[in-house]
Amino acid sequence: TMMPPKGGQLRSDMMAFLSKQSHKRMTDPEMGKLLDSLKSQNLSDEQAANVREVSRSYDKATKLPEELVEEKARHKSQAQQIWQEARAENDFKKFQPSLEKTVELTCKTAEYYGYEDNIYDALLDIYEPGMTVSQLDPLFAGLREAIVPLVKAVGESPNQPDTSFLDIGQFSEEKQREFSLKVAESIGFDFDAGRMDTSTHPFCSGA
């Protein structure tokens, strides 16, 4: 957030290096042996769940070559800075090559993970383990069938909410910051342990 623009290249190099080192640690054969040994232990439900999820991560990590992990991390960092510039200039074409490269690297990742019917199955499994496109499509089709007519009916209804309070104009960055600080303080945010800055896109993170 506070990094000067010319620090982008160094950041991308550092992110690539750290991702490479993390991948080496995660894919160490010793990690696999430790996970296998834990599966035969008398674990609590919570411990068993932890072992299961780490095993999933280990399995996926070992399918990816180190070079791809490094390239993805470097590109992600570089693309973020280009996106920030393109957003400020309202120029999508400036970001388009980076987005295309992101899709290309994501497809490579999916190929390494492997799939049976649809390339998206490999990516969907990251967030919804076991889910496939063939299972998901009927679900969304059913939702569309029910929701689209509902939204249309709501939009055409004579009983519309009063939204005039939304049409009061733009808010200055200073006023937005002032409001955000008050909200943070009201929920007990500790400014001795954290800070609030202005960024291209809102987010919250911690360490």
For every predicted segment, state its role:
Residues 1-129:
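A well-structured
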